[in-house]
Amino acid sequence: MKLENLLITGGTVIDGTGAGPRADTAVLLRDGVVEQLGAPAVQAAATDPSVHEIDATGRTVMPGMIDAHTHLTFGEPTGNDELFFHRTEAYSSMLSAYNAKKVLRAGVTSVFDADCLWNIAVELRDAIENGIVEGPRMRAGGQALMTSLGGTAGRLIRDEGATAYATVVHDQDMMVKEIRRQIKYGVDWIKVMVTGLIPSMKGPEVKVWSFDEMRRVCDTAHELNTKVVGHCRNALSTRDAARAGFDLIYHSSYMDDEALEAVVESGAALCPTFTLLGNLADYGAKIGSAPELLEVFRAEIEVTAAMLSKAHAAGVKILTGSETGFAVTPVGEWHARELEMLVDYVGMSPLEAITCATANGAFAMRAEGILGTLEAGRQADVIVIDGNPLDDIRILQDKSRISEVISRGRRIDLLTPIPERTVSPTEQVRFLAACPLTRSLALTEDDLERLSRV
C-alpha cells in the first residue's frame, strides 16, 4: 500500500491527549504524519491536488490503539504444554505474520510484544518495518528471563537453557550474559518473570527473584539503553520491581499501599492486563475452564482494580494490554476490552481509558511525543469509528464499526477477507479422555446391579 495524503473531514476528533472531543474537526495527514487539524487543515489541503478526502461525518476520529501486552508468536495455546512442546520455529514465524495483519484489522496500530517464542518478535518487527509483512508498529522483547520457579508452567520449564518463551538464568552472571545476548539480537525490552507458582504453596504466585538480582537486571539493561518489564502477580513483586528500577510492571496483582508508594516514587508505569482474567471469569464456563478458578480470577481483578484506581488518582501512567495470543484471548478479538474493564472496574471515564490506550501506550513503544495522539508532527496512525466510544466504550471492540485504519499514513484494506486459519492437529494436545474411565462412570446402575448377580 502506498503512502497517501489524506484529509479526514466531518468527524468528531478524540486526539488521545485527554482533551475533550472536538466536533466536525478536519485532520490532514501528509507524508506519513499528522500535519494540521481544524480549519488550517482544510485550507492546506485545498491547494494540494494529491490529497484524498475521507468523509467521517457521524463518526469518531482517534489515534490507532496501542496494545502494550501481546504474544503474537504463541499460536493461541489452550495451555502451557501446547505452547512449550507443540510449536516449531518456522511455522510460528509464519503464523505471527498472519496474526499481525489481524491486529491491524482490529484498529490496533501499535503493539508491544514483550516475550516470544525463539526470537521471532524481533524478526517480525523488522519484517513489518521493512514492508515485508503488513502489521502494526512493534516493540519487541525476546525470551523472558526466568528462574527455575518462574511463571505458571512449573516442572515443564527445563532446568537449563530455553523453553518456549523463557530462558532460565540461575545467577547474576548468567543474567548479565543473557541480557547482553538479547540486546545484541535486537530486543527493545527485557522481560523478567518476577513471580511464579510453587507446587508446595497454595494460592497466588510468589516472588522468585531476589531484590539484588532484579536490580542487576535493570542496571545491565539500562546501561545499554534497554528498558525492563516485569510479570508481577503479587504485592511484594510489584514493590520490589518498582524499587529495583523496572520501567513497566505487568499485572501488579494484589498491589498494596506499600507497593503503590514504591510505584509512585519510581515513576514506573503499570499495565494491568485484566482482559485475560476477565475473559476467563466471564466466559470461562463456555470454553471449559475449571469452574473453581472463575471466581478466583474475578476476585483478583476486583482487588487489583481498587488499588489501580488509587494509582490512577496518584498520577501513575496506566497502559492497556490484552495479553492477546492465548486461546482465551485470540488475536484480533479482544484488544479493546481492556478499555471497557478500566471503565467498569477501575472507574475511569471512557476518555481516560482511551488516553491509556493511545498516548500512554506510546511509553511501551518507546515513542512518547511521536505516537499515540492526533497532534501536528505525530505519526499518522489513525482509526475512524462508526459511533461515539465516549457514549459506549465497548464499540471499540466491534470491528464492523471500524470504517478506516490508517497506519503510517497508509489506508489498510479492511474489506478483503483474511483467510480463515485452521488449526493443525500437531499444534494441539489431543486427549484420549478428559478423565479416567472408571467402571462406575462407564456402566449404568442397572448394568452394575446385573453384574453383581452373576
Describe the residue ranges of each PLM region:
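Active-site metal-binding motif and surrounding structural segment of the metallo-beta-lactamase
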Residues: V42-M62
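Active-site microenvironment of metallo-dependent hydrolases
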Residues: M1-T25, R30-D31, E35, P40, ...
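Metal-associated gating/positioning segment near the N- to mid-region
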Residues: R59-I132, S148-G151, D212, A241-A244
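Histidine/acidic-residue-rich catalytic or RNA/ligand-binding cores of hydrolases
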Residues: E76-G79, A121, K202, T238-A244, ...
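Histidine/acidic residue-rich metal-binding segments in metalloenzymes
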Residues: E123, D173-L270, N279, G284-G288, ...
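Divalent metal-coordination and catalytic microenvironments
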Residues: G11, V27, G32, G58, ...
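Active-site gating loops and adjacent loop-to-helix segments of metal-dependent hydrolytic enzymes
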Residues: L72-S92, K101-L104, T147-A164, L197-S210, ...
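His/Asp/Glu-enriched, well-ordered alpha-helical/loop segment
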Residues: E223, E302-N388
